[in-house]
Amino acid sequence: MADEATRKAVSEIPLLKTNSGPRDKELWVQRLREEYLALIKYVENNKAADNDWFRLESNKEGTRWFGKCWYIHELLKYEFDMEFDIPVTYPATAPEVAIPELDGKTAKMYRGGKICLTDHFKPLWARNVPKFGLAHLMALGLGPWLAVEIPDLIAKGLIQHKDQNS
């Protein structure tokens, strides 16, 4: 299960109420509003705790999301582009976050750079539909994945800090 800091961070993210995906145009607007409010609250909380680690934005329809995430290791910032699409069956199905530049560098990743969240995150998501949203995906999915995988990839020499490449 999650550590105490993660539990605290997640407990401060507003739960969502609208059970709607992109196919339901009217309710989807309401769901998106809730998603943005939860994401804003999560980012504000992270900044207040000096734990700011991602930026995220979407297309106009809220169906394609993209941004940057980063991980600090030994005082060096490793930054990655990330992207995901909202599944048509959302929120019953969690989005699959991709970090394309890490594709093929870890076994905990699917083709196209989609991170593997099957064992730990997806059952938790399924138990919390429709209350969980994109902020929860970041807090309980991508964040822990980065914390485990990035130090391992650095130790194996599979990724290097951008300043070490010059």
From Swiss-Prot:
Q: Which Gene3D superfamilies match?
A: Ubiquitin Conjugating Enzyme (3.10.110.10)
Q: Which domain of life is it from?
A: Eukaryota
Q: Which GO terms describe its molecular function?
A: UFM1 conjugating enzyme activity; UFM1 transferase activity
Can you tell me which residues form the catalytic site? C116
* Keywords, sorted A to Z: Ubl conjugation pathway
What GO biological process terms does the UniProt entry carry, in alphabetical order? protein ufmylation; response to endoplasmic reticulum stress; reticulophagy
Which InterPro entries does this one have? Answer: UBQ-conjugating_enzyme/RWD, Ufc1
- The disulfide bonds in this chain are none
Recorded hits in SUPFAM superfamilies, A to Z, give: UBC-like
Q: Does the keyword Acyltransferase apply?
A: no
What is the annotated quaternary arrangement, including any partners? Interacts with UBA5 (via C-terminus). Interacts with UFL1. Interacts with UFM1.
**What family, per the record?**
Belongs to the ubiquitin-conjugating enzyme family. UFC1 subfamily.
Which function does this protein serve?
E2-like enzyme which specifically catalyzes the second step in ufmylation. Accepts the ubiquitin-like modifier UFM1 from the E1 enzyme UBA5 and forms an intermediate with UFM1 via a thioester linkage. Ufmylation is involved in various processes, such as ribosome recycling, response to DNA damage, interferon response or reticulophagy (also called ER-phagy).
> Would you tell me the protein name for this molecule?
Ubiquitin-fold modifier-conjugating enzyme 1
- Organism equals Danio rerio
* Lineage of the organism: Eukaryota, Metazoa, Chordata, Craniata, Vertebrata
